[in-house]
Amino acid sequence: MIPRIRLAVATIPAMAFLSCLRSESWDPCVQVVPNISYQCMELNFYKIPDNIPTSVKILDLSFNYLSHLDSNSFSSFPELQVLDLSRCEIQTIDDDAYQGLNYLSTLILTGNPIQSLALGAFSGLPSLQKLVAVETNLASLEDFPIGHLKTLNELNVAHNHIHSFKLPEYFSNLPNLEHLDLSKNKIENIYHEHLQVLHQVPLHNLSLDLSLNPLNFIEPGAFNKIRLNGLTLRSNFNSSDVMKTCIQGLAGSKVNQLVLGEFKNERNLESFDKSVLEELCNLTLEQFRIAHFGEFPDDVSDLFNCLANASVISLLSLNLHGLEALPNDFRWQHLEVVNCKLQQFPALKFNSLKKFVFKDNKHMHTFTEINLPNLQFLDLSGNHLSFKGCCSHNEFGTTKLKHLDLSFNEIITMKSNFMGLEQLEYLDFQHSSLKQANDFSIFLSLRNLHYLDISYTNIHVVFRGIFAGLVSLQTLKMAGNSFQNNLLPDVFTDLTNLILLDLSKCQLEQVSQRAFHSLPRLQVLNMSHNRLLFLDTLPYKPLHSLRILDCSYNLIVASKEQELQHLPRSLAFLNLTKNDFSCACEHQTFLQWVKDQKQLLVGAEQMVCTQPLEMQDLPVLSFRNATCQISEAVISASVLTFLLVSVAGILVYKFYFHLLLFVGCKKYGRGESTYDAFVIYSSQDEDWVRNELVKNLEEGVPPFHLCLHYRDFIPGVAIAANIIQEGFHKSRKVIVVVSQHFIQSRWCIFEYEIAQTWQFLRSHAGIIFIVLQKLEKSLLRQQVELYRLLSRNTYLEWEDSVLGRHIFWRRLKKALLDGKPWSPEGTEDSESNQHDTTAFT
């Protein structure tokens, strides 16, 4: 008998291995937040797990097999707030299935082929706000029993089979409904009667998404006097005429945000007819968004006339030729132009515009001055623009700018210190190349600036007054730049309100003792990815508010003894990982300090020694002061012993099952086999094993006796003992069902390796390989031994055809008969006759 302790140790990895074979996983749900949030995704559950605490609030059961939800299915979880049942093969939901979930706010049923939905299926959900029923075979809103869900805020029934847009009477009982997603259904026509409930009980905050429905007709007046917060119509129309007719049907409505267009991969219209937008004159719009249309007309002077009074305009992924001809009297306050392939920067002149986003338009290279006197927010990021002179109010035609983003552009030459832009609060230059930044105090006028990002702008800081004037700055990011002589000087004198400073990847080798003396409010300092050789703590002494200091990925060897006391008392997190620590006795004080400050150090266990050689790659925490009092010979011997013991332990752990098998072979080696074969397979292939392999071998002629884990393992016995004693020791042969699932399963490959050891120990044993499906060579080569074995030895390939099946079973039975203690001739003839009859009748 195997000792109990060894069996207990063996049981844990064996259970993980068996999860690839069983229809229900042995792995427990992932505890995301203890007692609060659990993820049970894709665990092959056939029922609601009962080992989850009743206090759970977020439960993800997606991708399981919960085909039938009975009443009170979730009564054990009264605190539940979010329940995800996506793609659980649910077909039936009974009355009161969710009864008792008084706090449930989100229910997700995406991808379930629901066939039967009881009238009281959603009863007992007094707090439900979001219901997602995407791809649930829903054919009509009339049949959806949700009229009692008065708290419902969002209803998503996209990707279903809804043909009628008629909103049921019960919508009058949903006063809080704000989002209704009907996209990707089969709605073709919309009539006045379909919206009767909105005429009677207006839902002014409702946003409606009808995208990807094949709309042909909207009855004129259907939306008259209806007020919507949002309406989305994308990839709905197969021609401009149909689109124009449908927009006419929206006449008289008031929509806060109207979205027209197509999706990138769902294009129906080759070109855009500007007459379509003329129909918008009969609508009242606040915001208009148009996306992914084809060619636009060259002349846009009158294109947006019907949108002159809108406040927000968004133009996304359009083939625009220019915007210069837009009238100046439009009342637009927010204009967004993204990825519109413009050839030159638009010289806009809007008095009303307050926010202008012009980004990812990569077909131009030169910035043109604009005149936007009331502009407060300007985003010009990602355009590959070059600025010959920056920055003052003259370029942007405004003195009211508060947000300026020029990131991810080309060369920006600094020729002005933001004269006229004193109200700026946010400034971003990251990944643009700044020129002449050291010539003068370029930020001198920006006394109101709170955020500055000059990361990766190729600045080589020489001028110590570069940050002069930034008295209100709270965040400074300047990663990826450099300093003269790789020394961080005292350049932050005016930044007395700074809270976050990022100096990563600045090639720093030294830090001036007074570099941070004027930063009393600094809380976060990033010094990672530099070239610091020592942890010099003296420069950080004035940082009385510092909480996070990141010095990871440097070349730090140690810290001088007298410096350790200078770290601020407020410091809560110090990251010293990925450095070149010396674990020599000369740094004994620092190494002891590391051990004493484990609570302060982030990832202290990951700090490793790089020298001396005998300590290389060992944890810093493994350093012992006692080693400094013994001879080098003792140290070397100790390290060598430690390595040998570690290697031995690893080898024993790695080949534990092989040793267990070897011991068992001595005990069972001479006994008679109970089974003809032990079957190794992935749980993903269990249907084939049950329906094909077991049926044809155990019910055929001659009958073979297979060892199958779900049937033949002895209850109450450790899984490891079952695998070896019942599986290998009592079987004449082993059948390995090879598939892509098998190769990708670590535990299936592990059991195959055990089978090889078994074959070696029992010379008369045999392994029969069945390739269930064609395998990609790149995937197969990942398992070198298996690839070599299949290349040099014969194996069976499953072919699902009449002739292929006949040959397959004939060859497999012949292989199994080898060594069987009865006459192979008689059985082979019987087998042949039976298969001939089966295959050719």
Curated annotation (Swiss-Prot):
It is found in: Cell membrane; Early endosome; Cell projection, Ruffle. It comes from the Eukaryota. Residues 579-630 form the LRRCT domain. This is Toll-like receptor 4. Residues 1-23 form the signal peptide. The gene is TLR4. Phosphorylated on tyrosine residues by LYN after binding lipopolysaccharide. Ubiquitinated by RNF128 via 'Lys-28'-linked polyubiquitin chains, leading to proteasomal degradation. It holds the Pfam family TIR.
